[in-house]
């Protein structure tokens, strides 16, 4: 009122004119004023963090210091609005592109189009404690596929969103199950209690996996990828590193471990901007 009044009272016309004048006045970008903040944002972008993750991380690590916080909108504007020129345009390549909508796949009128797997245990029989993500140790898995019969097994822990990747030499059930057994033996028993998979025939020999690891396997309903939501989301993130058409066989297990580590060190909004690594390491420590 005081900014928009006349000599003795509020004037609507003058208020409107003054408001537009203030809106047109150029404002200095927060990133331009703070070299530390600019370096911090650029460094996290180079690690493929999203602007939302960066903003959430800054707010969590500097809760009382607004000078060391910046909104994700400011980061986006600094990247996309050429006039600002605050963040280098080369950092644009580190933003994740939007996933295109998947085309629907033809469904076998008899049900599962991927073949019959014996002795499956349906996801509908999965204990309720798995559903609410309150207890760690329950994983979702899938195969990421590339040309020339190249595959990566992707595993995501539901409670912490922790990711593990395994190089797989083929899609046959013996090869896949062996790779999954090897990964399972790297973890404490308390942190690997169940695995949820789709109806892919690569897990036809799921009984051997359970016998070797004491890990229960549950299968999703046909054509229901949303029943492995964490894993589907992770596969989308992985396409930033492995675009469709990439021969996955050229990547070493060491590189897959590096990619998994990068994903696990990104803060997640769903974890109150903690990282999967922080949550998972706390779970490991609690096992003694």
Where are these regions (language model features)?
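Short, basic alpha-helical/linker "hinge" immediately adjacent to a nucleic-acid-recognition surface
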Residues: 1-48, 52, 56-64, 77
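Conserved short alpha-helical interface segments
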Residues: 2, 43-110
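Mobile-element integrase/transposase regions
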Residues: 28-32, 36-37, 96-153
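Mobile genetic element proteins and their domesticated derivatives, centered on retroelements
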Residues: 41, 54, 75, 142, ...
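Active-site beta-loop-alpha junctions of metal-dependent nucleic acid enzymes
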Residues: 145-149, 165-189
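Short small-residue beta-strand/loop micro-motif enriched in glycine and branched aliphatics
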Residues: 161-166, 219, 244
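RNase H-like two-metal-ion nuclease catalytic core shared by retroviral integrases
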Residues: 197-213, 219-242, 249-261
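C-terminal domain-tail junction helix/linker
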Residues: 244-288
């Amino acid at each position: 009122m005081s900014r928009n009044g006349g000599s003795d009272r509020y004037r609507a016309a003058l208020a409107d004119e003054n408001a537009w004048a203030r809106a047109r006045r150029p404002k200095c970008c927060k990133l331009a004023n703070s070299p530390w903040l600019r370096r911090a944002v650029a460094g996290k972008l180079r690690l493929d963090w999203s602007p939302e993750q960066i903003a959430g991380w800054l707010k969590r690590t500097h809760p009382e210091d607004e000078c060391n916080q910046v909104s994700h909108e400011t980061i986006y504007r600094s990247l996309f609005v050429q006039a600002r020129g605050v963040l280098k345009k080369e950092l644009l390549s580190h933003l994740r592109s939007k996933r295109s909508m998947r085309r629907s796949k033809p469904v076998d009128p008899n049900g599962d189009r991927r073949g019959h797997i014996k002795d499956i245990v349906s996801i509908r029989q999965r204990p309720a404690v798995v559903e609410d993500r309150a207890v760690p140790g329950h994983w979702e898995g899938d195969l990421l596929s590339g040309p020339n019969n190249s595959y990566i097994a992707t595993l995501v822990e539901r409670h912490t969103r922790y990711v593990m990747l395994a190089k797989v030499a083929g899609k046959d059930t013996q090869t896949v199950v062996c790779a999954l057994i090897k990964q399972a033996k790297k973890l404490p028993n308390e942190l690997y209690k169940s695995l949820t998979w789709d109806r892919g025939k690569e897990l036809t020999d799921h009984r051997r996996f359970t016998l070797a690891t004491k890990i229960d396997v549950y299968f999703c309903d046909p054509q229901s990828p949303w029943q492995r939501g964490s894993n589907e989301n992770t596969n989308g993130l992985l396409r930033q590193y492995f675009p469709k058409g990439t021969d996955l066989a050229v990547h070493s297990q060491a590189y897959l471990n590096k990619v998994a580590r990068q994903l696990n060190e990104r803060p997640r909004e769903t974890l109150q901007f903690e990282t999967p690594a922080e949550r998972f390491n706390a779970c490991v420590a609690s096992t003694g």
